[in-house]
């Protein structure tokens, strides 16, 4: 055995390719790529010698395909954007939502969302619709917001005719059977229960702050169906609403990944001259109200000590959201407000961080990093065709609510102060990056095309938006923030509110120079 090992060793050490000794990591061939354990002399900001310079893609937002818009004889707009790939996203967007329910039972849009893609004149059941889409690898979805209802399908582009025909049938010819309405009633009830039980209060707080900001008008109306209205919904109520708001002049058929001429042909075939299930006739009860910002406070006292969904206990928190009126997405100040919102940023105290998480935004640097007891501080910007709302959501222990409110009001006041050039450029870069990254997804492009054409009858291209973002100056941020601070605040509060300051004190803090709440003197603590 020893002789065999010795012979093999001699063979490997002999001549030929097998006998060549391999270079070791200590050899000069490797040593020139290594620092040898010492700190490298080349800084990370300098390119490595001998390495070719990489060519990066430019962030100009230029798209290879043009957004085309055609208006049919009945007023319906057809918008398309071609895109590489064999799949497409097609849908119908409608100027319909909770803001238009002033003359109707609140919650109709919420019910229609649950009834979407149910049985129609051509399809006997939801299963038949799904089987039809399955033949083209398709999926469907319906979403409602305060001002828009969207029916969408993603499928193989070869099935475009089938998809548009299906969408037209779903939107204009739903059966709305008693059984389907009862199923939708159960789904709405479950969603309302879930909304009140979930540990994350953000959807509920958003609902409350809109109610406070726009008292009983337009976008301040309930987005979710109130519990007392769930049992009142029937086919007649739904048809009365559909007759006035599901009209061609309030619709856009949008498609991404399709040829425009083919989409227009399908629209003429299925959406021109058709009689909807609720009959024809002029829309007479259409709400064209303009949003009236009122400001105010909405409070909901609730025991938040046991909201954990599992065995791990969740800390008892009080949540507040303070908002001020900003501007509509049609105004020139919309872009500065978007940059301001990105500059504020924020998040939760347990965020893992990482690239793009906004760890250098103001709400992280000034709030979460300095106050360990703050569980959340996040900025949100809601914008509509006639108004907007910039909010900060914060969460903390109920005993520190007053201090938390003062920290938030101070951050609002600081918005109108000095804006550092570095933080502004970082916010602009992050906003541009987020915009371009989101627009890589076909469904997002579809929604962008549809919403813009629905609101403005045209589409502002990404490179135009990038140019507007780059043009934002520190004085623009200071100007829009100063204008915003002159308005009344909208306040939403949820949880143990025993330490919540009075609304007048919050308003006084936002009107002060330093954002501090008025001092409260108590004889007994």
From Swiss-Prot:
Modified residues (N6-succinyllysine): 64
Family annotation (Gene3D superfamilies): Metalloenzyme, LuxS/M16 peptidase-like
Gene that this polypeptide is encoded by: PMPCA
Protein function: Substrate recognition and binding subunit of the essential mitochondrial processing protease (MPP), which cleaves the mitochondrial sequence off newly imported precursors proteins.
A GO CC term assigned to this protein in UniProt: mitochondrion
GO MF annotations in UniProt: metal ion binding; metalloendopeptidase activity
Name of protein: Mitochondrial-processing peptidase subunit alpha
Signal peptide (from-to): none
Transit peptide, residues from-to: 1-33
Location of the protein in the cell: Mitochondrion matrix; Mitochondrion inner membrane
PANTHER family cross-referenced by the UniProt entry: METALLOPROTEASE, MITOCHONDRIAL-PROCESSING PEPTIDASE SUBUNIT ALPHA
Disulfide-bonded cysteines: none
Modified positions (N6-acetyllysine) in chain numbering: 299
Lineage, broadest ranks: Eukaryota, Metazoa, Chordata, Craniata, Vertebrata
Organism: Bos taurus
Origin: domain of life: Eukaryota
Annotated family: Belongs to the peptidase M16 family.
SUBUNIT field: Heterodimer of PMPCA (alpha) and PMPCB (beta) subunits, forming the mitochondrial processing protease (MPP) in which PMPCA is involved in substrate recognition and binding and PMPCB is the catalytic subunit.
InterPro entries tied to this protein: Metalloenz_LuxS/M16, MPP/UQCRC_Complex, Pept_M16_N, Pept_M16_Zn_BS, Peptidase_M16_C
One Gene Ontology biological process: protein processing involved in protein targeting to mitochondrion
